[in-house]
């Protein structure tokens, strides 16, 4: 059948227009706001699909849609299944307490994943001594895990749109739990490397899906605080990992760095598998349509994803290749991704730099060195607490632009937070002499913690607002290049500090961070012009088509 035009859809005659309301909008124009594209099956349907089905509630639970049959040539009315008004099965209508519980479970899961990525940095020497390997081989164990972070989303993001979020959470976390065990009992470095790669791929799923899960649960005007809670988790985890790992390494040995991962990952798997229901609206409505077809003996009950007749190969091409198209053809995606890669790489460099400064320079133990990550974590928490205020400021800007602010307004937090990174690095660099007080480098970490969350959130929001219907692919591109670079930095950080010295190595990073400060300013002033010539950026013409 032909792809229906969005202006062909109309409501059931028994359902007056005023009986329809959007579940994630405060208006009656039936068009999704940018954040909603994380909650819509954009890559699962063709460009002519009508997305109202997923963002409206109707009195009868259906929207009548006329579609011309490719077989008979006649126009037939199909019943597009929707949620009913105040539908208890709509995740956005769940009680606020339960939505917060689900939010904290997925945020805790992200914390565990981030914790697992960094906890082993507390004792790189353990496997070296036991297996008789070089230091670079031991660092590869960290690297392959982060590489997995970049590879996994290419598979798990499309999988979640096809089968739902809950099965992907359950399957991948179970896989991650299983492959932590061989790490803890490994007899050689090969086992560690292979199993850590598998764990990295498996653990990437929660990081990939949580943004969509929160979009499933919360209306756009409610997402500010939940998103702040989530955004802090992936950065607090890496800060807490070396702290806990240091004490375990000093008192229990390096294998306990994996046993603690097993314990936390198992708890996260149990909580998210058995207490958090499916939240993805297209899957929920698809199951409802299947039940209605059977109960009513009427094949006309359907959903947009079921109407899409494109072969799976074409969908996979979009899933797998579109992120790279955006990365190499879109300057906005490329430079924002490079900037976030610098920030992410810096975070993993710190896992190596802190032991160099505190253990090598000051002669501290691993456990005491881990304490120096606390200011970094405090900076992250402080920044996350600022997120609601940043969101309120953006809402005021949005009102000033009649509800349609340019995407570049998302860069305002980045334009001042970007200076925190080089400032923190300069402080870290020139207070890292062995005879100076330990507080200096720690305060540098605090400044970096403050900047990193605001940069991360601002970058994500800018990409989502700029590409909207391509948002998932843009974020996947950013995640891929960010993870690959973060993995590489671990391998050369020690050599860089050895050859340049502690102060000048950190200063080099500070100058790189300083150069990156130009990126948000360039896009703030020139981004609109760049978007005008973009093949993929969202345009007003597309918005009018959606709202028609």
Swiss-Prot record:
Residues 1-32 are annotated as: Disordered. Its main location: membrane. Residues 21-30 have a biased composition (Polar residues). The keyword Metal-binding does not apply. GO terms for cellular component: peroxisomal membrane; plasma membrane. It is a multi-pass membrane protein. A motif (Peroxisomal targeting signal) lies at residues 258-269. Disruption phenotype: Leads to a clear reduction in benzylpenicillin production. The keyword Transport applies. Glycans are attached at residues 70, 93. GO terms for molecular function: transmembrane transporter activity. Keywords: Glycoprotein, Membrane, Peroxisome, Transmembrane, Transmembrane helix, Transport. It is found in: Peroxisome membrane. It holds the Pfam family MFS_1. Residues 1-10 have a biased composition (Basic and acidic residues). The chain crosses the membrane at residues 100-120, 139-159, 174-194, 197-217, 224-244, 256-276, 332-352, 370-390, 411-431, 436-456, 471-493, 505-525. Belongs to the major facilitator superfamily. DHA1 family. Polyamines/proton antiporter (TC 2.A.1.2.16) subfamily. MFS-type transporter involved in penicillin production, most likely through the translocation of side-chain precursors (phenylacetic acid and phenoxyacetic acid) from the cytosol to the peroxisomal lumen across the peroxisomal membrane. The peroxisomal targeting signal allows recruitment to the peroxisomal membrane by pex19. This is MFS-rype transporter paaT.
């Amino acid at each position: 059948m032909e792809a229906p035009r969005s202006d062909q859809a109309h409501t059931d005659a028994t359902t007056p227009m005023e009986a329809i309301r959007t579940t994630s909008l405060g208006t009656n124009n039936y068009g999704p706001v940018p954040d909603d594209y994380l909650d819509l099956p954009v890559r699962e349907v063709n460009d002519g699909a009508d997305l109202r089905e997923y963002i409206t509630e109707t009195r009868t639970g259906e929207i009548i849609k006329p579609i011309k049959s490719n077989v008979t040539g006649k126009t037939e009315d199909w019943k597009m299944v929707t949620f009913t008004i105040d539908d208890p099965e709509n995740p956005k209508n769940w009680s606020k307490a339960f939505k917060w519980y689900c939010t904290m479970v997925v945020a805790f899961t992200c914390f565990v994943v981030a914790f697992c990525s960094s906890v082993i940095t507390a004792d790189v020497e353990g496997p070296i001594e036991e297996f008789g390997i070089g230091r670079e081989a031991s660092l590869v164990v960290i690297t392959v895990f982060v590489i997995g972070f970049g590879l996994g989303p290419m598979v798990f993001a499309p999988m979640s749109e096809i089968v739902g979020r809950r099965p992907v959470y359950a399957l991948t976390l179970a896989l991650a739990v299983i492959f932590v065990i061989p790490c803890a009992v490994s007899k050689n470095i090969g086992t560690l490397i292979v199993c850590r790669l598998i764990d990295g791929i498996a653990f990437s799923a929660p990081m990939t899906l949580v943004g969509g899960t929160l979009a499933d649960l919360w209306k756009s005007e409610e997402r500010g605080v939940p998103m702040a809670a989530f955004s802090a988790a992936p950065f607090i985890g890496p800060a807490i990992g070396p702290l806990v790992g240091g004490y375990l390494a000093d008192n229990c040995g390096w294998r306990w760095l994996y046993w603690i991962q097993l314990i936390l990952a198992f708890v996260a798997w149990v909580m998210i598998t058995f207490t958090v229901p499916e939240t993805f609206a297209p899957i929920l409505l698809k199951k409802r349509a299947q039940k209605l077809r059977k109960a009513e003996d009427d094949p006309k009950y359907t959903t947009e994803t079921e109407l899409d007749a494109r072969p799976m190969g074409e969908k996979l091409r979009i899933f797998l290749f579109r992120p790279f198209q955006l990365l190499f053809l879109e300057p906005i995606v490329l430079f924002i991704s490079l900037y976030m890669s610098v920030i992410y790489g810096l975070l993993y460099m710190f896992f190596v730099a802190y032991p160099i400064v505190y253990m090598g320079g000051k002669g501290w133990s691993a456990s005491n060195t881990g304490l120096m990550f606390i200011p970094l974590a405090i900076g992250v928490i402080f920044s996350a607490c600022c997120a609601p205020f940043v969101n309120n400021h953006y809402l005021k800007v949005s009102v000033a632009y009649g509800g349609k602010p340019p995407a570049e307004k998302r860069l305002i937090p980045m334009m001042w937070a970007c200076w925190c990174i080089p400032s923190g690095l300069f402080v870290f660099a020139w207070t890292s002499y062995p005879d100076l007080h330990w507080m200096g480098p720690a305060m540098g970490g605090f400044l970096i913690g403050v900047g990193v969350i605001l940069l991360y959130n601002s970058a994500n929001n800018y990409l989502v607002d700029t590409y909207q219907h391509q948002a998932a692919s843009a974020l996947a591109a950013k995640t891929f290049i960010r993870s690959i670079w973060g993995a590489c930095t671990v391998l050369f950080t020690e050599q860089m500090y050895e050859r340049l010295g502690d102060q000048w190595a950190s200063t080099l990073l500070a100058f790189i961070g300083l150069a990156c400060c130009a990126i948000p300013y360039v896009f703030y002033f020139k981004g609109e012009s760049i978007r005008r010539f973009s093949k993929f950026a969202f345009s007003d013409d597309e918005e009018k088509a959606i709202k028609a």
